[in-house]
Design a protein with these regions (language model features):
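A contiguous strand-loop segment
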Residues: 1-93, 126, 311-317, 322-324
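C-terminus-biased signal that marks the final domain/tail of proteins
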Residues: 1-13, 118, 127-130, 135-136, ...
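Short, flexible loop/turn elements at secondary-structure junctions
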Residues: 18, 79, 144-146, 155, ...
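Short, surface-exposed beta-strand-loop junctions and turns on beta-sheet-rich folds
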Residues: 20-22, 81-83, 156-159, 166, ...
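Broad, structure-driven detector of short, well-ordered beta-strand segments within folded domains
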Residues: 28, 68, 149-153, 159, ...
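Proteins synthesized as precursors that undergo proteolytic processing into mature forms
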Residues: 92-128, 240-248
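Long, compositionally biased
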Residues: 135-159
């Protein structure tokens, strides 16, 4: 289970939590412009926009979980188990395997207008990366500074939803997630008035009672509502430090602690990492479950005209600044 969100001050920010019971050895990976992507059904992409994001690298190929390109378009793939369906290769379409979808989009789209044009021609297939690495059941959020969409490949076709919340979690499908927000239309960051009855002098006995009823569990529908409420009512300054800090606070509203979500006997889902991309400046920030310090990798401090992948391992050891 994972959560993704967008945020905008004077710059545009995008990120996600990756919630799972184990890591695949994730790294921050920069794919420079002249790295050659070998797509299974649509040939090679030898020159493209530079990309930075979190990935598992297999056979010198970046399997991105979330990423942004040098133009400010960002996207992430999140679990969509039970609903994701990837058809066979379809004639007349640009057939892209699900593991290729992120580089296919980010490699050639400079804005959401170009993303929409690309999506109109695409068929996302279930072609596996390798025999022992089948296609993951995913759906995607794609965004720039102006808008966001959710992309879901299901048995009844490819769905492309406008995403006015700039938020995505897992199941149910996105249109149902949006409908369920109707349950929370009465919530507010302000203190509520007594509308129960004029006959009862009911009072607010605590701050924060305007959001009474906001779900606090870890289910995907509840996380969707909680992070949407947090993000859409969020207030911060627009400096880099304030914006990045606020973004981590937004996703912090849905992070998972060890022991609270058991997935098997003695195994628990945790927030392995949280990312925050400044898509305007090309800076990838992250924290991990075991290291709360914010770490940054700036794509523009690398040679983006190169042809080889650039790797940075996640810094996992807790870093504590001692004041005395």
């Amino acid at each position: 289970m994972c959560t993704a969100a967008t945020y905008k001050t004077k710059d545009f920010y995008f990120g996600r939590t990756l919630d799972y019971e184990f890591s695949y050895g994730d790294q921050i990976v920069i794919t420079p412009c002249n790295y050659s992507f070998h797509f299974r059904h649509v040939g090679d992409m030898k020159n493209h926009y530079a990309i930075i994001g979190m990935a598992h690298v297999a056979e010198d190929y970046p399997l991105y979980y979330d990423a942004m390109n040098e133009k400010g378009v960002a996207m992430a793939g999140l679990n969509f188990v039970g609903n994701a369906y990837f058809p066979e290769v379809t004639e007349g379409k640009e057939n892209v395997a699900s593991f290729e979808f992120i580089p296919w989009v980010l490699g050639q789209c400079a804005n959401m207008k170009e993303v929409r044009e690309l999506l109109a021609k695409i068929n996302i297939t279930g072609t596996p990366f390798a025999e022992n690495m089948p296609a993951a059941s995913l759906h995607w959020i794609i965004a720039d500074a102006d808008e966001a969409v959710t992309v879901e490949s299901m048995k009844d076709g490819l769905k492309i939803y406008d995403n006015p919340t700039g938020v995505m979690t897992n199941n149910p499908p996105f249109d149902q997630q949006m409908f369920l927000l109707n349950n929370y239309r009465g919530l507010s960051p302000r203190q509520p008035e007594n509308r129960f009855s004029e006959k009862l002098p009911l009072e607010c006995y605590s701050r924060g009672m305007g959001a009474l009823g906001l779900p606090g569990d870890l289910s995907s529908a509840s996380r969707f509502a909680r992070v949407a409420f947090t993000k859409m009512n969020s207030v911060s300054g627009d400096s880099e430090e304030e914006s990045v800090g606020q973004f981590f606070h937004i996703l912090g509203s849905v992070e998972q602690q060890g022991g609270c979500c058991e997935v098997a006997e003695g195994k628990y889902e945790i927030t392995i990492y949280t990312s925050c991309c400044n898509a305007t400046k090309g800076i990838y920030y992250y924290t991990t479950y075991t290291n709360r310090q914010i770490t940054a990798v700036d794509m523009h401090r690398e040679d983006l005209d190169g042809s080889g992948l650039i790797h940075y391992p996640m810094l996992e050891k807790e870093q504590i600044l001692r004041q005395n």
